[in-house]
Every structure is written in C-alpha cells, then in structure tokens.
A protein has these predicted regions:
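Classical Sec-dependent N-terminal signal peptides that target proteins to the secretory pathway
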Residues: 1-21
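Short helix-capping/linker turns of helical repeat alpha-solenoids
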Residues: 37, 66-69, 79, 98-100, ...
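Terminal, low-structured helical/coil segments at or just beyond the last alpha-helical repeat
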Residues: 181-217
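Hydrophobic face of amphipathic alpha-helices that form TPR/SEL1-like repeat modules
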Residues: 73-81, 106-113, 139-148, 179-184
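Hydrophobic/aromatic packing residues within the alpha-helices of TPR/SEL1-like helical repeat arrays
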Residues: 60-61, 92, 128, 163, ...
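N-terminal leader/linker segments that initiate helical-solenoid repeat arrays
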Residues: 18-74, 216
Length: 217
C-alpha cells in the first residue's frame, strides 16, 4: 500500500495496544501552502529527495537545511532513524519555528514515546492538535485520542470528523477505518450502509495514497 520509507522506527505510530491499526509513517498528496515561499521551499527539498545516492542526497539537504523547513523536517526524521534524537529534535523544532506544520507529527511521536525527550503525552496531543487541520496524518493520529479517550475525554464525533478530514485527503487507512466504523457499528455508531458504500467506492478507485511523502528523505 505504501512504499517503504527511510524511517522504520516511525513506521507505526502506536498510541495504544488497541486493535485499531495505525498507518505507516511516511507524505501528503495535497499540501497546504501559506504562500509561494513555502511552495518554493518544498520544490527545493524535493530536488534533494529525488537524488538516489545517499551521500549526495544528504549533501543536497545540508546545503539548504539552515533555511528550508522541509529539509529540516526530513533531516529530523532521518536523525530519528539514526537515533540521533538531539539532532532530530533540533531539526524538527527548527521546522516548526519556520511554520511547517508537518513537523508536528514527527515531534509528537518523540514526545509520545519519550525518545530523546521526557515522555509528555500532553505535548504530543497539542502538537497533533495544532496541525490536524493541515496534515491528514496528524488528523488521523489525533482521531485515536478522541475515539479512545487518550489524554482527553472520549469524543466520537470529533474523532470521526478528524477521520473524515484525513479520508477526504485520500488517506487509505482513514477510509478503511470509516468503512469499519459504519459497517460494524464501532464506537457506538449506527451501522450505515450508505456511508459504507460511499467510502468503499472511493477506495475502489485505487488512488495512490501519497500522504506520507513529505517526511521521506
């Protein structure tokens, strides 16, 4: 379903041992840009992303990392893979300071797991919440908090709203979750054959889910 990416340690963002399965950690087919500067930054970072040789790829990113929030994001996730958490946190915070909402998910993972930082579920929740209206990945992960009452009271309506946002951006995992919810009546929802068919029809279109590309080195 999703290509293997450079950060296997982030491949499954598990908040709980519940049976709800999390998506692989990987970059959005849609990206919300606040201005042309942001789009240009992504374009420059994507030049590096397309380089196959790892040494040359890293050299490319390092040339632009001081000024490019997407390079900071990707070097951050790469540093997590290398277990250089100090550097990862530095890069990810740089990216967030430069208003890149996609870095929130990666940093939230570290705070949730307590990797390189003191474990802080409140911080993880806030980071996801702050980016959930932009990043489908963050919205999907945050839905788990609301559906299961992790660090907040159970709010099924909010959880489903977040799932629907992610699903509308072609996140396959969110689409499948909505099918399960309405087919099996999960989370005290009424079974709804019409909604099941709606999401199954979308899934059948087999549109490639590229919602994780933004994190790929």
């Amino acid at each position: 379903m999703i290509k293997k990416i450079i950060l296997p340690s982030l491949s499954i963002f598990l908040f709980t041992a519940c049976s709800l399965k999390m998506p692989e950690f990987s970059m959005p087919s849609f990206l919300s840009f606040s201005d042309d500067k942001d789009a240009i930054a992504l374009e420059k970072a994507n030049v590096c992303q397309k380089i196959e040789d790892m040494d040359n790829k890293l050299f490319c990113y390092r040339k632009i990392v001081n000024e490019n929030s997407y390079a900071q994001l990707r070097m951050g996730t790469y540093s997590v893979e290398k277990k250089d958490y100090k550097k990862a946190i530095e890069y990810l915070n740089q990216s967030i300071d430069n208003e890149n909402a996609y870095a929130n998910l990666a940093l939230a993972f570290l705070y949730y797991k307590g990797d390189g930082v003191e474990k802080d579920i409140d911080k993880a929740f806030k980071l996801l919440n702050d980016s959930s209206d932009i990043d489908p990945n963050a919205a999907y992960q945050l839905s788990r908090f609301y559906l299961q009452g992790i660090n907040t009271k159970v709010d099924v309506d909010k959880g489903i709203d977040l799932l629907e946002f992610a699903a509308s951006k072609n996140m396959l995992a969110a689409q499948k979750m909505l099918v399960s919810i309405y087919k099996d009546g999960l989370f005290s929802q009424e079974k709804d054959a019409k909604k099941v068919k709606q999401w199954e029809d979308i899934i059948k279109k087999d549109i490639r889910d590229t919602n994780f590309e933004v994190y790929k080195l």
